[in-house]
């Protein structure tokens, strides 16, 4: 249970810290990466949801 709580805290912490970068602008040469950069903070949450679905599939063994 502690590991799951730690994982949640890490995901929330990384999402909060990376949200401060939303106000920064990429250099013009990298402007085509903007859509990818906008999605990147969500990736840890997707991994957490994948782990949750996986554990539900094996009945939380």
UniProtKB/Swiss-Prot annotation:
Compartment annotation: Plastid, Chloroplast thylakoid membrane
Pfam families referenced in this protein's UniProt entry, alphabetically: PsbK
Keywords from the UniProt entry: Chloroplast, Membrane, Photosynthesis, Photosystem II, Plastid, Reaction center, Thylakoid, Transmembrane, Transmembrane helix
GO cellular component, one term: chloroplast thylakoid membrane
UniProt propeptide residues: 1-24
Transmembrane segments: 40-60
GO aspect biological process, one term: photosynthesis
Membrane topology: Single-pass membrane protein
InterPro entries: PSII_PsbK, PSII_PsbK_sf
Keyword Membrane among record annotations: yes
Record's function text: One of the components of the core complex of photosystem II (PSII). PSII is a light-driven water:plastoquinone oxidoreductase that uses light energy to abstract electrons from H(2)O, generating O(2) and a proton gradient subsequently used for ATP formation. It consists of a core antenna complex that captures photons, and an electron transfer chain that converts photonic excitation into a charge separation.
Subunit and partners: PSII is composed of 1 copy each of membrane proteins PsbA, PsbB, PsbC, PsbD, PsbE, PsbF, PsbH, PsbI, PsbJ, PsbK, PsbL, PsbM, PsbT, PsbX, PsbY, PsbZ, Psb30/Ycf12, at least 3 peripheral proteins of the oxygen-evolving complex and a large number of cofactors. It forms dimeric complexes.
Family classification: Belongs to the PsbK family.
PANTHER family, per database record: PHOTOSYSTEM II REACTION CENTER PROTEIN K, PTHR35325
The name this protein goes by in its record: Photosystem II reaction center protein K
The organism of origin for this protein: Liriodendron tulipifera (Tuliptree)
């Amino acid at each position: 249970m502690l590991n799951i709580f730690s994982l949640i805290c890490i995901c929330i912490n990384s999402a909060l810290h990376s949200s401060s970068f939303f106000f920064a602008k990429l250099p013009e040469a990298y402007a085509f990466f903007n859509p990818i950069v906008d999605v990147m903070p969500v990736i840890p949450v997707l991994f957490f949801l994948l782990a949750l679905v996986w554990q539900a599939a094996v009945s939380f063994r």
